[in-house]
Amino acid sequence: MSRTPVTVRAAGACDVASLRELWSDILRRGGLDEQLADVGRIVTIAAGRDDQCVVVAEVDGEVAGAVYLEAGTFTPLNLEPAVLAVSPHVFPRFRRKGVGSALMEAACRFAEQHGIAHVQTAAAAESRDANRFMARLSFAPQAMLRAATTSSVRARLPKTRQAATPAASSKQRIDRVLAARRVRRGERVPG
């Protein structure tokens, strides 16, 4: 079985609509115009920086997939250099045609150009095919990234911790100051 040749290149402004469609499930929620503006900004910023790149894979001149690459560190606490390959996505009609491999090859090439020995990526936990693909490429699980809204986390925290918010602490400090003033004036302190 021969594969259709896959070419990779840096994304440009002409790719914004295709990238928005490809990454629609991971972009912030909003209208089409907002998402297009977000992707346009990402592509523009990456094009102007040496440590970032949006790579597009094409099959027969049509965008088949893309990945965002950024040279940085493993984590803010682990300063080992690493390239983060964010959201390597392939359109469903181009899967199993070498597009994903071409994107990850571009990530390795980007890492080598920056003298970086490690590439890291993430796949959605429920995406069995993506996780198997990454495992075949020798990516080992490192962490489980979780996300929640601030309000939902706060609702699940113990109420005793919530009482220590800055507003409550400020009220407690004011009560102490007023009590100290009463003591100095010789007034009786309630309680």
Q: What are these language model-derived features?
A:
Residues 2-3, 135-191:
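Terminal substrate-recognition subdomain of acyl/acetyltransferases
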Residues 6-21, 32:
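A short beta-loop-alpha structural element at the N-terminal edge
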Residues 111-123:
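Conserved GNAT acetyl-CoA-binding A-motif
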Residues 90, 96-109, 136:
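Conserved acetyl-CoA-binding loop-helix of GNAT-fold acetyltransferases
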Residues 68-82:
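Conserved acyl-donor/pantetheine-binding loop and adjacent beta-alpha core of acyl/acetyltransferases
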